[in-house]
């Protein structure tokens, strides 16, 4: 069924220019996802490993005042991004696979390819971060796992990677149903943490942590230092739009995105702020990951750490499931649109893009091996995940700005333009805040991926690159070369 879409899309490509009239509707896939299920996918994608390490990360960078400002900026910026995905789902319901489809429709096939690959790669690296954190959690009682970066930890994470591959291969609908159940199960421990932390909150400790310490620098530096972590924890806000071709009703995509985002924002901010009332921020900054476990253990005793640890494992497994579903979907649709090689088009009778799923698992496996050579496996995976995802996000927000002025959306153009512009500015700010290290590492990942794009073009008997695409290629290759040079000379490190 999935393969039947290819001919119609290939014919559309020859006549449709970026941002013009939408093509005809595509056949509806077998799985039909309701609004609660789509909302669960958004929440499940965002509530993963990151939230359990927020207390330590924020305490390393800032006090209560800086945290409040950071969440205000992150919340407003990510709200604009969530509204962009909601708007695009309404204005262009013909576009499937969310982030990738928007970049291609707005800026052509090559940048669309980069968006698809970058988003997919960010999910794969993010899944490795999840594995590292699970192993670090269990490492508290099994020292052989260390901080999740030992050979034993990597071996166990490998078993988990391939176990999920087999689960998802059984069917999209079944995996999505499991994700909805897991989303409910993993939210409970986080809410319990917030309630207990409020009960044990010490106002004197909270006041002492309010302005941070001299070592954290100026308030601006404090806030900037926290933002990369907020990018990581909010990755997945586009979850419903990525899986929109499976939605029972297309209008549910935008509603699920907004509802999921607002719910998660409240949870993330609460987890961070209440922790400042339990321990001095210097002690929080020294906690073992997941730092939420250390905070609750300090408040209520040993059982609190165990409780959070169990909650983390459930949470991470659920987020891994949701992210893997989205990653495989993006590769599959890109292959359907002839922007990835044809071998990625294969889907099972249960509508599972099995070869895209296999590629996802293989890349995660490769990154897992690389983390064995990094100084801090979790921080490395977190930073690279965020940097890889920001380019696809920026292209999506730019597309929203582009279509805002088109005649067919004139009635909504002012509001759409404001939202799209604010989301674009916020995304650029995050790219700057990420720093040069992870941007250069991202180029090293992006540039070699062009081989897949060239394979797809050769299969179609087309010229490999247009004039404009050659410019993009030159920039990506130059960035990758600079990144390799920086690694070689020790300017940056893993």
Named regions from a protein language model:
Residues 1-61, 65-68, 78-86, 94-96, ...:
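Membrane-interface "cap" regions at the ends of multi-pass membrane proteins
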Residues 20-30, 68, 145-152, 181-309:
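Helix-loop-helix junctions that connect adjacent transmembrane segments
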Residues 30, 34-35, 154-158, 248-250, ...:
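Loop-to-transmembrane helix boundary motifs in multi-pass membrane proteins
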Residues 59, 70, 79-161, 165-169, ...:
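Hydrophobic transmembrane alpha-helices that form the core helical bundles
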Residues 59-63, 67, 136, 140-153, ...:
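Transmembrane helix-loop boundary segments of multi-pass membrane transporters
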Residues 100-103, 108, 140-144, 226-227, ...:
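TM-loop-TM module centered on a large, flexible mid-protein loop between adjacent transmembrane helices
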Residues 152-203, 257-261, 386-391, 415-422, ...:
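Membrane-interface loop-to-helix entry segments
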Residues 347-348, 393-479:
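C-terminal membrane-solvent junction of multi-pass transporters and transport-like membrane proteins
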């Amino acid at each position: 069924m999935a393969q039947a879409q290819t001919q119609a899309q290939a014919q559309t490509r020859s006549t449709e220019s970026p941002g013009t009239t939408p093509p005809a509707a595509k056949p509806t896939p077998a799985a039909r996802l309701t609004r609660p299920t789509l909302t669960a996918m958004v929440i499940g994608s965002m509530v993963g490993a990151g939230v359990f390490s927020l207390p330590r990360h924020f305490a390393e960078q800032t006090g209560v005042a800086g945290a409040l400002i950071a969440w205000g900026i992150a919340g407003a910026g990510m709200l604009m991004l969530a509204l962009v995905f909601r708007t695009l789902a309404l204005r262009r319901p013909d576009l499937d696979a969310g982030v990738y489809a928007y970049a291609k429709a707005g800026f052509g096939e090559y940048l669309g390819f980069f968006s698809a690959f970058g988003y997919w790669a960010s999910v794969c690296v993010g899944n490795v971060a999840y594995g590292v954190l699970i192993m670090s959690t269990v490492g508290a009682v099994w020292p052989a796992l260390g901080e999740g970066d030992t050979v034993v930890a990597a071996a166990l994470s490998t078993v988990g990677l391939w176990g999920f591959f087999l689960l998802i291969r059984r069917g999209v609908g079944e995996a999505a149903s499991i994700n909805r159940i897991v989303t409910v199960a993993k939210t409970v421990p986080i809410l319990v943490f917030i309630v207990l932390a409020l009960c044990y909150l010490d106002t004197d400790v909270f006041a002492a942590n309010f302005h941070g310490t001299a070592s954290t620098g100026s308030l601006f530096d404090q806030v900037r230092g926290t933002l990369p972590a907020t990018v990581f924890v909010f990755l997945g806000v586009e979850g419903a739009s990525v899986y929109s071709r499976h939605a029972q009703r297309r209008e549910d995509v935008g509603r699920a995105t907004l509802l999921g985002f607002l719910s998660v924002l409240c949870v993330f901010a609460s987890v961070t702020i209440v922790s400042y009332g339990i321990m001095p921020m210097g002690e929080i900054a020294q906690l073992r990951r997941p730092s939420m476990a250390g905070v609750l253990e300090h408040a209520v005793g040993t059982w609190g750490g165990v409780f959070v640890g169990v909650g983390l494992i459930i949470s991470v497994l659920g987020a891994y499931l949701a992210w893997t579903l989205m990653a495989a979907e993006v590769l599959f649709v890109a292959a359907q649109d002839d922007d990835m090689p044809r071998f990625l088009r294969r889907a099972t009778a249960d509508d599972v893009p099995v070869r895209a799923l296999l590629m996802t698992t293989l890349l995660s496996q490769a990154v897992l091996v690389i983390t064995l050579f990094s100084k801090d496996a979790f921080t490395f995976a977190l930073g690279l995940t965020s940097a890889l995802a920001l380019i696809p996000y920026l292209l999506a927000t730019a597309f929203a700005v582009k279509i805002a002025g088109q005649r067919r959306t004139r009635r909504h153009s002012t509001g759409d333009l404001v939202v799209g512009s604010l989301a674009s500015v916020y995304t650029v700010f995050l790219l700057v805040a990420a720093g040069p290290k992870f941007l250069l590492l991202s180029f090293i990942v992006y540039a070699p991926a062009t081989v897949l794009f060239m394979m797809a073009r050769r299969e179609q008997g087309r010229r490999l690159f247009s004039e404009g695409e050659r410019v993009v290629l030159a920039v990506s290759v130059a960035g990758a070369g600079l990144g390799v040079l920086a690694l070689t000379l020790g300017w940056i490190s893993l």
